[in-house]
């Protein structure tokens, strides 16, 4: 990062000049697809996914080093009584990931996906967004930079997920700030908020948006004031993947909040991304619609942990395998249409 200027300056520069897809690789993928032993378009979105992989990786579609990156953070807003679980559960779940006992571990084993877990100062929750900014600009920028390291070990498909007690409140606040409407439209039960607790959750989002209202026209200010460390790190990871032309699968409502920040900063910022699934959290489909995306899966899930993105990675791997492994009409001796 630069040693001059404001902490966000480097990210504003990156967001202004994002690399695009490789048109030659896309053309080559389309030409091969036209020769495969199937009617045109018969594989539906699998074909679109293969083209997307080719365009962003600049090669024939292949997934050889898929990675799930989970970012874990804690939030000061939990003291407002908006969740039935204490913040200590975040650390406990990080330990569960390390021990191989979480749902995401089983999915990664099933689909042969790598897994990295990044815990982000769990003993130091962010500021309570109903009272103060979640992060300083310096801390937010540093956390984004930390998130960029998710791709350091090498990957050709990055799945973005998270863990953090209270972070569906944070996601709701971000989407409310970016897209308007009412707070109630964006707030859902998360890990089980209902009744009076759900009312407190809505009130917290309303209070936070009102407190920071004068600063919410800037997406990066939305991130630092209403976000959290895992949101900032996910935004950094998605951005780093773009700079290296690595395709990304985004998980649920909270991961989508990080994506929404980037989309607000540059309308093309998510062109290298797919939405893995639509979760049961009520605001998620609305947020996906705002991004102009279509999720790959709709399984009624609302766990987080990158689980929906990881399941979608199995579909992406299948798309690449079909594209590369299927015979052509000529090689199989199958008659093509006239």
UniProtKB/Swiss-Prot annotation:
The keyword Transferase applies. Keywords: Cobalamin biosynthesis, Glycosyltransferase, Transferase. It is an enzyme of class 2 (transferase). The active site is at 305 (proton acceptor). Signal peptide: none annotated. The keyword Glycosyltransferase applies. It catalyses: 5,6-dimethylbenzimidazole + nicotinate beta-D-ribonucleotide = alpha-ribazole 5'-phosphate + nicotinate + H(+). Its EC number is 2.4.2.21. GO terms for biological process: cobalamin biosynthetic process. It comes from the Bacteria. Coiled coil: none annotated. One of its GO terms (molecular function) is nicotinate-nucleotide-dimethylbenzimidazole phosphoribosyltransferase activity. InterPro entries: Nict_dMeBzImd_PRibTrfase, Nict_dMeBzImd_PRibTrfase_bact, Nict_dMeBzImd_PRibTrfase_N, Nict_dMeBzImd_PRibTrfase_sf. NCBIfam families: cobT_DBIPRT, PRK00105.1. Catalyzes the synthesis of alpha-ribazole-5'-phosphate from nicotinate mononucleotide (NAMN) and 5,6-dimethylbenzimidazole (DMB). Belongs to the CobT family. This is Nicotinate-nucleotide--dimethylbenzimidazole phosphoribosyltransferase. It comes from Rhizobium rhizogenes (strain K84 / ATCC BAA-868). The gene is cobT.
């Amino acid at each position: 990062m630069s040693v001059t200027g404001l902490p966000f300056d480097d990210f504003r520069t990156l967001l202004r000049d994002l690399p695009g897809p490789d048109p030659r690789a896309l053309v080559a993928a389309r030409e091969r697809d036209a020769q495969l032993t199937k009617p045109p378009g018969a594989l539906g979105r699998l074909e679109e996914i293969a083209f997307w992989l080719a365009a962003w990786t600049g090669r024939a579609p292949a997934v050889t080093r898929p990675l799930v990156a989970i970012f874990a953070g804690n939030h000061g807003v939990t003291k407002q009584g908006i969740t039935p679980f204490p913040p200590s559960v975040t650390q406990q779940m990080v330990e569960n990931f390390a021990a191989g006992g979480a749902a995401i571990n089983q999915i990664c084993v099933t689909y042969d996906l790598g897994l990295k877990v990044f815990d982000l100062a769990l003993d130091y929750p962010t500021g309570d967004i109903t009272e103060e900014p979640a992060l300083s600009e310096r801390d937010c920028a540093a956390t984004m930079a930390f998130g960029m390291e998710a791709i350091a070990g090498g990957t050709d498909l990055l799945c973005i997920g998270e863990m953090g007690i209270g972070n569906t409140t944070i996601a709701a606040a971000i989407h409310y700030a970016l897209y308007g409407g009412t707070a109630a439209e964006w707030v859902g039960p998360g890990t089980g908020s209902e009744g009076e607790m759900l009312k407190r959750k809505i009130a917290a989002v309303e209070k936070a948006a009102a407190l920071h209202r004068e600063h919410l026209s800037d997406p990066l200010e939305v991130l630092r004031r209403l976000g959290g460390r895992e949101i900032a790190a996910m935004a950094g990871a998605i951005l780093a993947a773009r700079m290296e032309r690595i395709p990304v699968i985004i998980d649920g409502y909270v991961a989508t909040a990080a994506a929404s920040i980037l989309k607000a900063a540059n309308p093309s910022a998510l062109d290298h991304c797919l939405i893995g699934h639509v979760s049961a959290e009520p605001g998620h489909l609305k947020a996906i619609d705002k991004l102009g995306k279509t999720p790959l899966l709709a399984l009624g899930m609302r766990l987080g942990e990158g689980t929906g993105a990881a399941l979608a990675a199995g579909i992406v791997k299948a798309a690449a395998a079909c594209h590369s492994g299927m015979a052509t009409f000529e090689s199989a001796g199958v008659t093509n249409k006239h």
